[in-house]
């Protein structure tokens, strides 16, 4: 079985995600749903998130439920754990 941790964040919250990510563990991956509000200009992706076990998907607009649903749509593991930044 595989576990995917779905992390929802918005705008500059992407810069704090590395505090939630553990060292690589076999069978565990992370999907980060990075929401951009209308007035946000995306920044460079933090280098600490550029790993094989981390996938980042983006979403325009606002709304936590919308962001969570977006993460679920992109999830692929047997078990998913949804969390916010």
Which residue stretches match the model-derived regions?
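Conserved short acidic donor-positioning loop in nucleotide-sugar-dependent glycosyltransferases
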Residues: 11, 34-40, 62
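Glutamine-centric residue-chemistry signal
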Residues: 23-24, 35, 59, 67
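Short, well-formed alpha-helical segments that are part of the catalytic scaffolds
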Residues: 3-26, 40-43
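Anionic, Ser/Thr-rich low-complexity intrinsically disordered regions
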Residues: 10-11, 46-51, 84
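Catalytic metal- and UDP-sugar-binding loop of GT-A-like glycosyltransferases, i.e.
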Residues: 60, 83-84
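Active-site regions of enzymes building and remodeling cell-envelope glycoconjugates
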Residues: 27-31, 45-58
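Short aromatic/hydrophobic "clamp" motif used to bind/position activated sugar donors
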Residues: 80
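Glycine-rich, basic loop-to-helix element that forms the pyrophosphate-binding segment
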Residues: 59-75
């Amino acid at each position: 079985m595989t576990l995917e941790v779905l992390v929802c964040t918005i705008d500059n919250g992407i810069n704090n995600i590395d505090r939630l990510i553990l060292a690589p563990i076999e069978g565990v991956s992370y999907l980060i749903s990075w929401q951009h509000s209308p007035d946000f200009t995306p920044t460079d992706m933090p280098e600490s998130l550029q790993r094989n076990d981390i996938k980042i998907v983006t979403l325009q607009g606002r709304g936590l439920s919308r962001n969570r649903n977006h993460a679920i749509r992109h999830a692929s593991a047997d078990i998913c754990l949804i969390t916010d930044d």
